[in-house]
Amino acid sequence: DRQVGLFFWLWIGQPAATGAYDAGALLEQENGRDILFHQDVPESPDGQQHFWGKPLWGYYDSADEWVIRRQIELLMLAGVDFIVFDTTNARTYPQVYEQVLAVIQAYQQAGWNPPRAAFYTHSHSLDTVRVLYEELYRPGKFASAWYQLDGKPLIIAYTASAPDLAEAAIRGDTAYSPAELSPEILDFFTFKRPQWPFDPFYPDGFPWIEWTYPQPLHGDVMNVTVASHPNV
């Protein structure tokens, strides 16, 4: 029973975008590379995310319901079973994921079979799990839109503080001090371990991107990367 999932970003236009900046358009200019990489100018401000090109539906915001509906429609037509929200940097973007989950439920109520959704955590994983549990899962919001594995909502996260602290230490984050997850939370989810491409191979890992070819099998999960991270 094979299923297909896609990594899904929530942060386009969120939470502090000041405009739409197109790296492809900049590079077409005579001094575009210098503007993009070495200048802090209005057409390419430091600290702002840049589109690599103009998207199909224009320079959109991830919270735009019209765009979300088009995205879910295409995923349904492609036969995608689930999407995995990127909350790997300890931001959960509830103003966006609630819109996506509401659209999924609307399609369900109309008789369609849209992909369900799960979350991927990494930095400050345990704290992010707690936030998601309190924001979404404990109150049972949009429950029919949750992607479930082995009868429980799937979440990609650490289950203990030791690997979470080790990840923070790699980034020089010595102030992070997470409490252990409660038995209630540990029992609520089906957990998969975050698998970063430069980490050792984890048989139970859930990779969001893969740098190895042929792609390794992590238990029952294989990642097929069709477009890699811009820093690679």
Model-flagged regions — what are they?
Residues 1-232:
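Glycan-processing catalytic domains of CAZymes
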